């Protein structure tokens, strides 16, 4: 969110002044590459995988293939942005949910169009895996396990099926 904020540079300077710590705001590509390195250092990923990092201001999709540099797509589809732009009621109305679905689908279709020419063969459900990282995904894993307190040992390498995600969505 900081990299897109109108007052982002001002905010960074204020934090640097108060803490004495230098801050570098990462580009979406840098964030994706670092997420990929972190995930692949801690997860036994197959030769080909897609890593997703749903942040507040953006979502990074990282296509990773053994021995090739990752292909990073940074999309302005963050959880905070989407909620602020589209949701007005709690729980969200069916119309709001539909609008969010449509917005996400359109953005993903646009972002993924160039991937067809990348050195990544078409996905194969039998061999490919989607790996989630960061807050939104770890929150889903915590909810699925009914954790009262975040425990990385319970979250890392946790397998969350599409059915379980759908079940969580219905509960929320």
Regions found by a protein language model. Name each.
Residues 1-48, 63-172:
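Helical "lid/coupling" subdomains associated with nucleotide-phosphate turnover
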Residues 48-58, 62:
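A generic, well-ordered mixed alpha/beta core segment in the N-terminal half of proteins
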